[in-house]
Amino acid sequence: MAVSKFVQIRRDLHKIPEIGFKEWKTQQYILDYIGTLSNEHVEVKVWRTGVIVKVKGKNPEKVIGYRADIDGLPITEETGYEFASVHEGMMHACGHDLHTTIGLGLLTAAVTERIDDDLVFLFQPAEEGPGGALPMLESEELKEWKPNIILGLHIAPEYPVGTIATKEGLLFANTSELYVDLKGKGGHAAYPHTANDMIVAASHLVTQLQSVISRNVNPLDSAVITIGKITGGTVQNIIAEKSRLEGTIRTLSVESMSRVKSRIEAIVAGIEASFQCEAVIDYGAMYHQVYNHEALTREFMQFVSEQTDMKVITCTEAMTGEDFGYMLQEIPGFMFWLGVNSEYGLHHAKLRPDEEAIEKAIVFLDQYVKWKGTRK
């Protein structure tokens, strides 16, 4: 059965997931598609592995921005799709193929029927890490076209197609990666008294970290520390000289993030003293909370509820991390969840979003942008 133009675009993109700042094929695909739309009203800039596109308005008073993240994840796909990833060990497991497709659909509509205001589309690399939103925001390429209003979306497997979910104010958490490297003294398993076991040190550290949230953060102010990976040792009869812990920190307030990091540093210092080892902490990529502009979000929710076919749900904040939060620090705007009704969740190897959501999103966002960017 033939599929629609934009479903096919999504499938094309799904085949070529690429990690942050290496999205060369994705960038070229976007540029090639934009080339089919180009006219005197369309301007294109390349920023690293991303693309910035401006559609000139007929009588602009402001700039409306749409941001789509374009990178994939280092996950081996298990969807069974005929159009599964052709890049081994890589997958679009967070819906960025849909985000990008919806952006191209909205761009197509904008070129076909121009509005009064300027539109800027940000096809942003590296959302999954190391973070592309902040450097794109600070780039010379964007300064001239910086939006006055910006919006973004994220697919939501748990919501049905035809539904969006968002809220005023805090939507997504502050997030930080966490890496701790421990170094002691290795040795033979038969002579533990001559060595300094970093497997044991790492085990104690993981256990002690469990008290950081439960005893240092207000229970009404949610926070999470997860250690997702521990490595150490080389063979079963050698005491490990080194170990490494990798995890994530998520909080719903900046104050809690600061407090949690302070406690982690104190506990790691205690591990150093207790086990006579060296420890190095690296917080890796850190993302600012996604905080929706109250008035714009309220207006958007009302418009979608009253003037489109989409159902609007007021959701609660989530511990999800998104570097779009940096853009919302500087530009009034909002992010929302788009229902795609998948049995499997984000970052799962079997994530299968319902493609019907693509056309629905393009249609209702085009309605909103035309309403917001046209003089009444």
Curated annotation (Swiss-Prot):
Residues that span the membrane, as ranges: none
Catalysed reaction, written as an equation: N-acetyl-(2S,6S)-2,6-diaminopimelate + H2O = (2S,6S)-2,6-diaminopimelate + acetate
EC number(s) recorded for this UniProt protein: 3.5.1.47
A GO term, aspect molecular function: N-acetyldiaminopimelate deacetylase activity
InterPro entries in UniProt: AcetylDAP_deacetylase, Amidohydrolase, Bact_exopeptidase_dim_dom, Peptidase_M20, Peptidase_M20_dimer
This protein's pathway: Amino-acid biosynthesis; L-lysine biosynthesis via DAP pathway; LL-2,6-diaminopimelate from (S)-tetrahydrodipicolinate (acetylase route): step 3/3
UniProt keyword list: Amino-acid biosynthesis, Diaminopimelate biosynthesis, Hydrolase, Lysine biosynthesis
A family per Pfam: Peptidase_M20
Hydrolase found in the keyword field: yes
Broad enzyme group: hydrolase
Gene3D superfamilies to which the protein is assigned, alphabetical: 3.30.70.360, Zn peptidases
A single GO BP: diaminopimelate biosynthetic process
Active site per database record: D69, E128 (proton acceptor)
PANTHER family: N-ACETYLDIAMINOPIMELATE DEACETYLASE, PEPTIDASE M20 FAMILY MEMBER
Role this protein plays: Catalyzes the conversion of N-acetyl-diaminopimelate to diaminopimelate and acetate.
Family of this protein: Belongs to the peptidase M20A family. N-acetyldiaminopimelate deacetylase subfamily.
The protein, known as: N-acetyldiaminopimelate deacetylase
Lineage of the organism: Bacteria, Bacillati, Bacillota, Bacilli, Bacillales
